[in-house]
């Protein structure tokens, strides 16, 4: 994108281009040739006849009369010719004089034009230098503004660092609170010891408890050693704090030395600035002198131009007069020539004596020609002299031009010196500004360091007081311990209970230590992140400087457009006033609409609350009814089973009695064959009855099992429906939160002039909400099955996962996590996710949460390949694993044998409730298998892997979710569970485990 996009009024808009003046070069003047050519002189031609045949044939009398007449005519003609020749000669002289004047005036004009061109070039050069200086001034102003922006950015960074320091101080206060809690625990221990002493007073008589007392003695010594280790740790912390204090003192002294050096540099710089200011004043005086000379030259140029214009006017007038006179003379000449020809014809016809007169006239004409030739030679000599003078003038001109060039060179050198001095001045002024800014920043840092030193001293004093108190308490405890050594031998059975409490205390202390260690690690990570951010900011600074240099050029163009924009802004101000009046009306309408929307939202919220209450009541009633029905059914089934068992036992007992009554001694007693037959018949009847009763019993069991399966399936469906409703409710609540935030933004913006843009409204959304695209693993093996993209929304209470944006619009999430059940959020390492690619690892992060905080849709997994024995199949809550039975086992669904010694049929076993069944039942989708009776442990922890689009987004998500983690652990959950079940503990608990769903994993 270009740094500046100018507004164009049309396709032929060239207002953004500068009008460049064409460089008018010096006019080419060819020198006058010194050799005489003669092509500028007029040609005069005449004709004559050499034969005298006309004279021989004429009479002498006729010749005399004609000669008299011809003489008179000839004299008149000669007079006219003389007059004409004199006029011609005068006009030729005038013409030569005018031509000489024109040449001299042209030479003068050429000189003046050259001088004017040189002065124009000098003026243009000066104007260009002035414009360059102005541009440099604008660039310097732009740089100053940029440095101010950079200073503001550094101030913001410093504020951020101060905020982090404040957070670290808060953590220190938390540690102090922990130490106070330990003191309270010590007080509790002392109270318990007093109770033990009272118990010892009561039970001194018993001597059998000596061994137990010795054990308690050793345990107390261990507790004292633990307290001593705690004391040592506190002493070490105190030493660390003292070392940090000494380091801060050293830094303070170093900063003071740097400040003094900078003050010295500042004094030196101020002296340099004074010298430069003196130089600037001298240069300004020189510039004024040059300007004065320029003004004089311009005045002379104007006078010369006026003279030139006047001479041009005179020249034009003379040319017009000469042309007019030449034309009139040519016309007269033509008329006289014609008349002369006519008279010649007449004279030839009438008189032959005129030829003699002509010969005389010709002689006279030859004399005149000779005179004219002599005059011409004189004129040529004059021309040669004039050319010599011209050559001398050319030499003088060249000398004057060389002098001018020398002067222009001196002028350019002076201008270069002026430019260099101005540049030095600007550089030194920039250095001065930079030094002033650095002094200010260092003074500010020194003040901050002083404040930090005071705070550190206060903290050290508080820690020393705490140390003294602990030492005093230790001394008291040692005294009590020495006094109680004799009494310890007579402690009794109540000590076991107290030992239990002490073990609980130890576990709490361990947990607190682990939490402190985790906080320290997090602080180290934060410091590393800050260092990385510092490096990235340095690179960004370099990029910003390069951008600034490119923007400086754009700034010049923008400042040229500024004047036009100010004029347009005045026009736009009047328009804005009208628009503001219109927008005030729209604001009132929007406020009315806002009030209506708030009312609608309140109504919706009330309806939502009522619906949730109704749902809860209906769920409770349904649960009670289901429990009553199940209890009644269980009681009825138990009664039937008991009665059938009693009947069965009675029948078996009868059979045993009958069998016992038989006498197998044939030799002694020979029973009758009829009695035997009767007994056999009775036995058969009894066996038939038994079989019938067994069949009835089996039918009843199958019926009841089917009913139970149906009830459990209904329960599962209703639970799934309830989960879906809860998920939809959560998504609706997040949408309502977003709408409320937007409404608050609208209510805050009272005037239309301060209405935020679309970008600002997006930026003003509450910090509790974040949304975007994240990827979730399809199954356990990421390398084989890959990732699945989901749209994730984090509201103030829930984390919602959508398959796509349509599901988000329809408020149909695939999974919802409760933020209150979050334990931990962290970026993942190579050891955690060894199946993922190395490029993806910096983008992956892990969420640890309680199982009870998860709510998802029941999506049945795809059939798993037989090769993967570690994978399992989900069906009605079961997690079936494929197995083979070589020992006796029956199917729990169809009661058929499930085993064979050599070729057992394919079987499945639930790894939760250990129900066995044939694989065919699940493949054929038979409804014989009852739902799983064993559910997940609600208090078990679970983790989820999430893949962000980039590393920056991963950091953003992690920091946001870390802020969301509740400080108190979820109710009903063991605090140590997520730590003991960490992903990096053992190979069995690594990510090689099979995931239950697309993202979750049972821990």
UniProtKB/Swiss-Prot annotation:
Principal subcellular localization: cytoplasm
Pfam families, per the entry: PH_MRCK, Rho_Binding
Residue ranges annotated for the PH domain, each copy included: 767-966
GO terms of molecular function: ATP binding; protein serine kinase activity; protein serine/threonine kinase activity; Rho-dependent protein serine/threonine kinase activity; small GTPase binding; zinc ion binding
Cofactor requirements of the protein: Mg(2+)
Transmembrane annotation, as ranges: none
Activity regulation (record text): Activated by RHOA binding.
Residue span, AGC-kinase C-terminal domain: 1-58
Domain RhoBD: start-end pairs: 598-664
Keywords assigned: Acetylation, Apoptosis, ATP-binding, Cell membrane, Cell projection, Coiled coil, Cytoplasm, Cytoskeleton, Golgi apparatus, Kinase, Magnesium, Membrane, Metal-binding, Nucleotide-binding, Phosphoprotein, Serine/threonine-protein kinase, Transferase, Zinc, Zinc-finger
Polar residues bias (residue ranges): 979-1003
Coiled-coil blocks: 71-341, 660-751
Start and end residues of each REM-1 domain: 128-205
Annotated site, Cleavage, chain positions: 762-763
PTMs per UniProt: Autophosphorylated on serine and threonine residues. Cleaved by caspase-3 during apoptosis. This leads to constitutive activation of the kinase and membrane blebbing.
Region described as Auto-inhibitory: 764-1003
Known catalytic reactions: L-seryl-[protein] + ATP = O-phospho-L-seryl-[protein] + ADP + H(+); L-threonyl-[protein] + ATP = O-phospho-L-threonyl-[protein] + ADP + H(+)
Zinc finger motifs (Phorbol-ester/DAG-type), residue ranges: 877-930
Residues recorded with modification N6-acetyllysine: 296
Start and end residues of each stretch annotated as RHOA binding: 647-659
Domain notes: The C-terminal auto-inhibitory domain interferes with kinase activity. RHOA binding leads to a conformation change and activation of the kinase. Truncated ROCK1 is constitutively activated.
Described purpose of this protein according to its UniProt entry: Protein kinase which is a key regulator of actin cytoskeleton and cell polarity. Involved in regulation of smooth muscle contraction, actin cytoskeleton organization, stress fiber and focal adhesion formation, neurite retraction, cell adhesion and motility via phosphorylation of DAPK3, GFAP, LIMK1, LIMK2, MYL9/MLC2, TPPP, PFN1 and PPP1R12A. Phosphorylates FHOD1 and acts synergistically with it to promote SRC-dependent non-apoptotic plasma membrane blebbing. Phosphorylates JIP3 and regulates the recruitment of JNK to JIP3 upon UVB-induced stress.
Listed name of the protein: Rho-associated protein kinase 1
Source organism: Pan troglodytes
Gene from which this protein is expressed: ROCK1
């Amino acid at each position: 994108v270009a740094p500046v996009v100018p507004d164009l009024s049309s396709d032929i808009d060239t207002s953004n281009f500068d009008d460049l003046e064409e460089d008018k070069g010096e006019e080419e003047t060819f020198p006058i040739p010194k050799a005489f050519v003669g092509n500028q002189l007029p040609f005069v031609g005449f004709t004559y006849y050499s034969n005298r045949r006309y004279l021989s044939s004429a009479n002498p009398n006729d010749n005399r009369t004609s000669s008299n007449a011809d003489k008179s005519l000839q004299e008149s003609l000669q007079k006219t010719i003389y007059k004409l020749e004199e006029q011609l000669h005068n006009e030729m002289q005038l013409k030569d004089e005018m031509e000489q004047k024109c040449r001299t005036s042209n030479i003068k004009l050429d000189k003046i034009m050259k001088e004017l061109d040189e002065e124009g070039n000098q003026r243009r050069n000066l104007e260009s230098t002035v414009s360059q200086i102005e541009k440099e001034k604008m660039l310097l102003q732009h740089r100053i503004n940029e440095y101010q922006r950079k200073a503001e950015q550094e101030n913001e960074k410093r504020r951020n660092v101060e905020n982090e320091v404040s957070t670290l101080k808060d953590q220190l206060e938390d540690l102090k609170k922990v130490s106070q809690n330990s003191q309270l625990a010590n007080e509790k221990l002392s109270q318990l010891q007093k109770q033990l002493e009272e118990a010892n007073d009561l039970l001194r008589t018993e001597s059998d408890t000596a061994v137990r007392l010795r054990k308690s003695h050793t345990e107390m010594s261990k507790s004292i050693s633990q307290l001593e280790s705690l004391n040592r740790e506190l002493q070490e912390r105190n030493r660390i704090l003292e070392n940090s204090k000494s380091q801060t003192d050293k830094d303070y002294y170093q900063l003071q030395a740097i400040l003094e050096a900078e003050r010295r540099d500042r004094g030196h710089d101020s002296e340099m600035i004074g010298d430069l200011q003196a130089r600037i004043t001298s240069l300004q005086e020189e510039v004024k002198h040059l300007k004065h000379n320029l003004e004089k030259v311009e005045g002379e140029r104007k006078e010369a131009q006026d003279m030139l214009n006047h001479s041009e006017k005179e020249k034009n007038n003379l040319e017009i007069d000469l042309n007019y006179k030449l034309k009139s003379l040519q016309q007269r000449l033509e008329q006289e020539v014609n008349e002369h020809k006519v008279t010649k014809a007449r004279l030839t016809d009438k008189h032959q004596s005129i030829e003699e007169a002509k010969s005389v006239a010709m002689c006279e004409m030859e004399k005149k020609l000779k005179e004219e030739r002599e005059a011409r030679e004189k004129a040529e000599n004059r021309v040669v002299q004039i050319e010599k003078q011209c050559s001398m003038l050319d030499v003088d001109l060249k000398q004057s031009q060389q002098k001018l060039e020398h002067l222009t060179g001196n002028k350019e050198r002076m201008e270069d010196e002026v430019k260099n001095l101005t540049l030095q001045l600007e550089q030194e002024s920039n250095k001065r500004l930079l030094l002033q800014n650095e002094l200010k920043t260092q003074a500010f840092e020194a003040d901050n360091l002083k404040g930090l030193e005071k705070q550190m001293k206060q903290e050290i004093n508080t820690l020393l007081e705490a140390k003294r108190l602990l030492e005093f308490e230790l001394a008291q405890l040692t005294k009590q311990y020495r006094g109680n050594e004799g009494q310890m031998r007579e402690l009794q059975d109540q000590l076991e209970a107290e030992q239990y409490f002490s073990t609980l205390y130890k576990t709490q202390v361990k947990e607190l230590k682990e939490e402190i260690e985790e906080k320290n690690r997090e602080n180290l990570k934060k410091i590393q992140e800050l260092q990385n951010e510092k490096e990235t900011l340095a690179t960004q600074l370099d990029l910003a400087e390069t951008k600034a240099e490119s923007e400086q050029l754009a700034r010049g163009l923008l400042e040229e457009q500024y004047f036009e924009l100010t004029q347009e802004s005045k026009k736009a101000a009047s328009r804005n006033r009208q628009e503001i009046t219109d927008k005030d009306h729209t604001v009132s309408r929007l406020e009315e609409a806002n009030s209506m929307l708030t009312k609608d939202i309140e109504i919706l919220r009330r309806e939502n609350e009522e619906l949730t209450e109704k749902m809860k009541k209906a769920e409770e009633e349904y649960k009670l009814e289901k429990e009553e029905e199940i209890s009644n059914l269980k009681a009825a089934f138990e009664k039937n089973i008991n009665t059938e068992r009693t009947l069965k036992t009675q029948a078996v007992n009868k059979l045993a009695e009958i069998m016992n009554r038989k006498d197998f001694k044939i030799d002694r007693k020979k029973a009758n064959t009829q009695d035997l037959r009767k007994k056999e018949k009775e036995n058969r009847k009894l066996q038939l009855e038994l079989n019938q009763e067994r069949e009835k019993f089996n039918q009843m069991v199958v019926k009841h099992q089917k009913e139970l399966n149906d009830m459990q399936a209904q329960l599962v469906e209703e639970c799934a429906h309830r989960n879906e409703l809860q998920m939809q409710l959560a998504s609706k609540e997040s949408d309502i939160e977003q709408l409320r935030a937007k409404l608050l933004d609208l209510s805050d913006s009272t005037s239309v002039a301060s209405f935020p843009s679309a970008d600002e409204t997006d930026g003003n959304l509450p910090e509790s909400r974040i949304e975007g695209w994240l990827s979730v693993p399809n199954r356990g093996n990421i390398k084989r099955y890959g990732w699945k993209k989901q749209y994730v929304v984090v509201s103030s209470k829930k984390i919602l996962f959508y398959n796509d944006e349509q599901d988000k619009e329809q408020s149909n999430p695939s999974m919802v996590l409760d933020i209150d059940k979050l334990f931990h959020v962290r970026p993942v390492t190579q050891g955690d996710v060894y199946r993922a690619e190395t490029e993806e690892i910096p983008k992956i992060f892990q969420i640890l949460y309680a199982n009870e905080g998860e709510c998802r849709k029941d999506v049945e997994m795809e059939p798993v390949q037989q090769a993967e024995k570690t994978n399992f199949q989900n069906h009605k809550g079961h997690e079936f694993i494929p197995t083979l039975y070589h020992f006796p086992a029956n199917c729990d669904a169809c009661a058929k044998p499930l085993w064979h010694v050599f070729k057992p049929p394919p079987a499945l076993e639930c790894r939760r409730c250990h129900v066995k069944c044939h694989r065919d039942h699940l493949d054929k989708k038979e409804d014989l298998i009852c739902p799983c009776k064993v559910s997940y442990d609600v208090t078990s922890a679970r983790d989820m892997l999430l893949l962000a689009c980039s590393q920056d987004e991963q950091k953003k998500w992690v920091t946001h979710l870390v802020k969301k983690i509740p400080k108190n652990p979820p109710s009903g959950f063991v605090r140590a569970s997520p730590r003991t079940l960490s992903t990096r503990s053992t190979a069995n608990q690594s990510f090689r485990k099979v995931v239950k769903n697309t993202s979750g994993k049972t821990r």
